[in-house]
């Protein structure tokens, strides 16, 4: 797994609300490098209710695959991390970088704060008119 090519920024076009009820998350990886990408996402204050969802390749260019998932938001306080798999190799990728999943107890408050990317609150002002208009055809 080429970890150097993996990229996500929670305050960018890699994580943003596309409507008042939908939050889009993207991950970049080396083209053809990963077998599976799972997004683990949920309410940061009700972390035990998190969901594990497979991400699909949204697009590719010469160097990278871009994975994405649109999360239906029921609470605007979102936290998430990625589980990356290639063959028998697994890595958890979060705000503090990479970790082996078996070494992290994600259910401990300290661990989830260390691991998770955070989008603190989906404010109605953060949902741009352009995003609303662009996704009316969905």
List the predicted regions and their residue ranges.
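Glycan-association/targeting regions that enable binding to alpha-glucans and other polysaccharides
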Residues: 1-129
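Single conserved hydrophobic/aromatic residue that forms the stacking wall/gate
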Residues: 131-138
């Amino acid at each position: 797994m080429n970890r150097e090519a993996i990229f996500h920024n929670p305050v960018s076009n890699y994580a943003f609300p596309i409507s008042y009820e939908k939050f889009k998350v993207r991950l970049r990886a080396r083209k053809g490098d990963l077998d599976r990408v799972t997004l683990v996402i949920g309410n940061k204050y009700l972390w035990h209710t998190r969901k594990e969802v497979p991400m699909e390749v949204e697009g590719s260019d010469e160097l990278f695959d871009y994975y994405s998932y649109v999360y239906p938001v029921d609470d605007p306080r979102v936290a998430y991390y990625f589980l990356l798999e290639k063959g028998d190799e697994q890595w958890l990728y979060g705000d503090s970088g990479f970790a082996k999943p078996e070494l992290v107890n994600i259910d401990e408050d300290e661990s989830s704060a260390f691991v998770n990317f955070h989008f603190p609150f989906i404010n109605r002002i953060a949902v741009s008119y352009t995003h609303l208009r662009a996704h009316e055809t969905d």
